[in-house]
Each structure stands twice: as structure tokens, then as C-alpha cells.
Amino acid sequence: MDKIIIKNARENNLKNVSIEIPKNKLVVMTGVSGSGKSSLAFDTIYAEGQRRYVESLSSYARQFLGSTSKPDVDSIEGLSPSISIDQKTTNKNPRSTVATVTEIYDYLRLLFARVGVPYCPTHHIPIKSQSIEEMTNRVLELEEGTKIMVMSPVVKGEKGTHADTLSKLIKEGYVRVKVDNVIKDLNDEIVLEKNKKHDIYVVVDRLVVKDGIRGRLFSSLETACNLSHGKVIIDKLDGEDIVLSEKYACPYCDYSLDELEPRIFSFNAPYGACSCCKGLGVQYKLDLDLIIPDRNKSINEGGISTINVDESSNIIYTELNAVSKKYDIDLDAKIKDIPKEKLDIILYGSKEKLEFNYVSKNGNTRTNYDYFEGIITNLERRYIETKSSWIREWIEHYMNEIECPVCHGARLNSNVLSVLVGNKNIYQVTELSILELKDFINSLKLSKEQEEISLIIIKEINSRVDFLINVGLDYLTLNRSAGTLSGGESQRIRLATQIGSRLTGVLYVLDEPSIGLHQRDNQRLINSLLEMRDLGNSLIVVEHDTDTMLAADYLVDIGPGAGDNGGRVIACGTPEEVMANKNSLTGKYLTGELKIDIPEKRRRGNKKFLEIKGAKENNLKNVNVKIPLGTFTCVTGVSGSGKSSLINEVLYKALAVSVYGSKVKPGKCKEIKGLENVDKVIQITQSPIGRTPRSNPATYVGVFDDIRDIFANTKEAKIRGYDKGRFSFNVKGGRCEACWGDGVKKIEMHFLPDVYVPCEVCNGTRYNSDTLEIKFKDKNIYEVLNMRVDEAMEFFSNHPKVLNKLQVLHDVGLGYVTLGQIAPTLSGGEAARVKLAKELQKKPTGKSVFILDEPTTGLHTDDIKKLLVILERIVDNGDTVIVIEHNLDVIKVADYIIDLGPEGGNKLGGNIVCTGTPEEVSKVSGSYTGQFLKKILDTK
């Protein structure tokens, strides 16, 4: 069958969608946010393919994977084995790096195990084991006529008179020894100081290098090795000594390594990992400045921040009062005035037992005698022992990541780091970018034997490197943590890995692979997709990028709107056929009938600036730049050019310190002028709004508090005495205790992404049955959380407080998202827009700076148009918007552009290419952004 036939798909908002999708083609699905693209591509087509795969496995295998429900669809025919490459499965495991997820590290481990040369870390000489035959050949390579002594080091750096050793040598018939660099006759009396270290080398033979000595030399070397457990020193009377060893050890200090195996180069295995950080390269330490942010406060005023938010704070205050009484500590005094030795008791615990009198809620008193654990000691213990990801995440707010003091971030132990290939150890190789690795691997100077051994290994590394370069990731360093990659970067890494696997007959479902990619690199990505297609695979790509849509063999436009207004196939066919369809919103944007207009004039700002001088963070090359306040500024450049380093690391962190007194460490720069002109800074990134099911859009923007108030004020709730806390899933009372109000249970898969399964007690509702009996307008709290934002706006139309907060979520294009959608399932773009919605509720100050990192992620051109209206509104209120962006529809409407590059990575990135209005940048021939802008502005 040459097509996938779908009949009556009803998953989520799909309206009985029936469609035939050609196989072995590049198929692009597009439409506004929430129209149903992902519901069709991922929740229907991919989910059914995955379900069928699981069903085909043995019952033994299925017990580990669990059952997957069938998508709501009548039938799907012609389905191939399916693989999903989306943005939501980024591996946050700190042990995952670019090198490990691309499998390049596996081949590097193999390369180092097979051709690596171990060096003694003390004497910096290669460690080699040599047979007597090899030693003989080595000596005979010396210039003819060279006078040598074959010596055996029987004593090396040892204290004592060594009388027994010398006596034994005389009995064995030896005549001369070299004692502390002086040749002595054994027949003479040799007196050595007892408390000094000595070296004693036995002179086994004296020779002149010439033809005919091989037999004698071989015999002498063998004798020398037997005397000193495999070590020989060849003393060239007129030159440096040659040290030879029969063992795999340093001949000077006996430093030795086990046989080189790939496993010892893994930081995920105990054989190679640094024993201090267990292969993480970093340690997490509680930061006292984060625990006590303001030492002018007293403990009773909340000076210790962890006590204020900890559910067990009443217990701790009981214990603190006992500590205060015992050690005469004034809990109302400013923390800075408490003597260090007394504050240490509060922080690190007591050395003697105290009397604690605990009072329960019903008034009962319980007395206990125990040590006071201490605030910091308590947090450290709980961080190690807890199985709750929520508790661990909360404690991490008070921790700092510091470089491991032993391996200094290398993750591996010193033994492993002493093995070199091309004068680099394996950690130094992982510090290279993908492009630099290609140069390094292909310029290695290897012996003929090493070349033969490494030929296939280097071929495999080159293959993976080429695929990564082709998807625009040449700037990434191999040791970059996988958790720091953007959704687009991690997806393109997985895409490169799949291309490298050379599978055929597979259905790939991708989610916006062009995210984070500069227009310059778009064609390379499209070529990679076409290459996968040409291998005999089918590709379904959810995408908004114009170039990708025009390159598609088949285009599917879903809409017309979001949520209930979407879920229909509006147009399908070749890109030309979709453009000819008058009902297609996408088609109208592709033809230019609809477009985002270029403003008639650009704002000049309020004549105030943020001026960054001498920025050197990551790959930034002493960057100097001025950002006009009161404008919409776009920071552009190819991937890896330094945009995030300049804006997120240098500027944002400096503003956070200046405005809020934050404890973060700003990126390296000489100075930043104009900080006094900013009274508020808001950073909107694609990082999750939370990492647990407790976080959702409703709680994040604060509307859930108002909704709980409404439920608490219902007649039935008042009769039962329920307050708003009853409707919280974060505290005991109304929540389901089996899942702690999560509605799901997390199953840690260790080597796979964690899996969330519905709680079998509450069936995913989060609440107990008593709480769910309380209804407002015939809906319980769970049913309200399941409403989409647009539905909830109608439901709460008579509650202005709720409506206003929901309106902002709608305005940023999230009307289709459910109020209770758990944070881990939100895409990076959705998470960013939830954060923006929260900030838009607040009144403008005229001195605020909004920093957004790729806010157009996941947005159709029509959604971008709406987002730009909001950003323009912020700037019109006098505030400043700084956006890191690749999308030309955003760049062309900016007031000011800062273009970095010219390329990505350490060598060619990190410079200011040009600055100015879009018109000014478009005239700079050396700017890739300018070249693409010119095409757009010329057609204005």
C-alpha cells in the first residue's frame, strides 16, 4: 500500500478526520496553534503505530512497557513502524551529553582503548610494556659505537643501609653498582646513610653497540629484568638514560594502568568515573546566601527562607524555640547580629540532646529528647533520602552547582585522563565542537598499525559528525549537557542519529525540526529530511517554516482555528494546490495574500541605553554593544553565534543582580552601563514552568487561587466547612493521598524518559471523592481543570478576576491549552507563552525589560501576528523588549537589530557583525541575517 488511510480520527479536538496520506514522501502538517496538527500526527498516527508495535511484542516484554490505549479513530491502514522525534523528550539526565546521545562518545571510547597511549601523570612519559626482543631492538637502534651499561634498578628511592641487598649481589657474582649516580665497586666497602633515600642500580653488562652483540645483549637484558621485576636502565655513557619496562607501568615510579578497555573511559561506570563527583563533573552544594538572602531580617521575620515555605515549619519553629532557650539565641535579633558559633548550631545542629515539646493540632503535647539536626543538615539529608521529585526540586532552589574540586569538570579519574590520542585526553576531545572534532580526527598522526585498527572507528565518527553538521549543529561542543539543549537542537540531534542509522520502511513523525535554526541553515535541514525520504521512509513533519512547507511533497492544513474551532482538514495536496485553496489560512500566507506588515517607521527609544562593554562569556570576543531602551530589539545570528551568551548569561544575570539583588553570577564582561534605568527584568525562556505534575498553566498564572475561592464559596462547601485549601492538590485534605494530588504516578525508566501513568485510586482526578462532590455550575474542580482556556473564559464570564487572567492566556495564543495540563507535557514554546501571560497581568512600569528567547516556537504565522501585537503593546507602554529570534517575520518588524556571528562556535562566532535598523542591517553584505532581510525588504 502506497498511502496511509485514516478514517474518522476523533482524538482531542479532531472532528472525524478522514484523510489519505502518501507514503515514502515528505508530508508537512501545518495550521494555527491548537488546531489539531499534533493530535493527528502524534496522538493518532504515531500513537497507533507505537501501540501496534507494543502489541506485537511478547507478553513478557509488554509487562515492562505497559499497555497503551488505542487512539480514538475508526481505522488506520497502511501504517509502517513509527518513530517519533519531538521536542518533549529531551533527556534532562545530567549524565547525558551531546557526545553520548549521538553515540560519538562510544566510538571515542573505542578509539582511546585501541590506539590511546597512557602516560605517567608524574613523569609525563609514555607507559609501554616491551618484550625482551623489543628492548633488544630498541638498544640496537642506537648509533654504532655507542658505549652502554645494562643496569637493573634493584633499589629505587628507598631509605636504609641496604647492606643485605649489596651482600646478596656480591654472592651472585656482580662486580659494580651505581649508587646515587656514582659507580662503585662491590668489593669496596659501601656505607649508606640509614635515614636517606637511595638508588642502587646493578651493572649487569657493559657493551659497545655493534654487529654481533644481539645474543649477549638479549641475555643481559633478560638477567636485568629478572633482578628488578621487569625494569632495565640503559646508561648511555655520553647521553640520557633509556628506561625500559617489561610491565605496563612507569619504569620510574611503578605507576601502572590495567589493560585499556572502552568501559574505563565511561564516566557512567565506576571503572572510569571520578570518585568524588561520581562522573557528574559537578557537585551540588547548599548555598548559605540563598538560604539566608537577607541577614538584616530576624529568624522570626522569615530570615531563613527555607522555613517559610516548608510544610513542616511549625515543627522546626518548635525545635528552634528549644534551641533558642538552651543556647540563649534571640530569634528576633537580626541574623547578622547572631554570633557565628550560635548561628552554626541553628544551621548545622547541636552536639547535645535537647528537650522538644511538640503540640499537635488537637492540643496534645509530646516530649522528645534528641539532637537538633540543623537547617542545612536537614536539607542535605532530605535531598539524599527523598523519593519526591517535588521536594528535590524545591531544595535545589537553594543549591549551587560547583565544579568538582578533584576532576575539575572532566568527570573521569586521573588514570583515564592520562591516556592520550593526538596529545589530547578524552575529556579534552569532548571540549571540541563538532566541526573541530572533524578536523582533529582527520589530522591524527598514527602509525600504520594504529591506522589499520582505527580505520572503521574514525569512519563511524566522521559519519555521525557529518550528519550533525548537515542539520546545522556544527557549533555544539561534545561535552555540552543534553539538558541545556533547546527543543530544536535536541530534536535535530535525534534526527541526525536516525539518518545515521540508515533505516528504511519507517514512518518518522517530527515536531518543528527547524526551531532555533537560522534561515541560512534551513536548506541543509531540508536536504537531510529529503535524504531520509529517499532511503525509503515516510516523513510526517509538523512545521510552520515556509521553506519546509514549500519543499514538501504533500501539505496538510488543519484548522481553521484552535480548540473547538479547529480539528478539520482545510486543505491538502501539493503546496501549489494548498495555495490555490481559498479556505486555507496557510495558503494565503504562502501566496502573500496575508502577511505581517513591515512598520512604516522604527522607534528610536527613550534616548537611554544599556551598554555592555567587554563581554567575554563562552565564545564572546570582547563584545561592546548598546541596546536602546524603549524599543523592540531583536538579537540575531546563526546557531552558536553567542546570542544566548550575550543576552541570557551576561545581560539578564547582571540585571537580575542589579534589580533584585539576585545571587546568580553574571557572565564575564568588563561593565554594563545604564543599569539604573531598569527597575524590573523579566526573562521568558522555553524552560519548563515546573518539572512535576503539580505545575500547570492555572497555578502558574495564579488563576487557580481565584477558582478555588469560587468553589469554597459554594453553598455545599460552606455547609461542609471546606475552605479554599480543600481544593488544593498540594496539601492534605481534599487531594488524593495515593498520588499526593499529582493525578499520575511517575515510573522512573532510568535509561529511558520517565513515564507518567494515571493514579489507579483517583483515576487521574487528583482529588478524593468528597472533594469532587462539590460543584460549581454542575462542574467539579477536576472538570474545571480539564477545560480549555477558551472554554473556561465562557464558563467564568461573570467573574472578572478569573476572566482577566484567562484573557491574557488567550491573547498569547494559548486558548486551546487546558487549565490543568501538567507542566512536563507543555512544549518549550507553550511554556514560554505561559510565563509571558503571567507577566502581562502586571502593570507596566515604563522601566521594565522583557527578554524572550525564541518566542515564536510552535507558532503559525497568524499566531506570530497576534504575539507581535502584544509585544508592540509592551513597548508602546514605555518598556523594552529584547528578543532572541531567527524568524524573519519578527526580525523585520524590530526597531533595532544586533547581529552576532559571523558563524557559530568558539573560533568564528562571538563577534558583533552589525547593528542598526532592519534597513541598515540589510545593507551589510557580511551579515547572513542581512542577506535574508534584504530579500524581504526589497519586496516591501
Could you say what each language-model-derived stretch is?
Residues M1-K940:
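Conserved phosphate-binding elements of NTP-dependent enzyme cores
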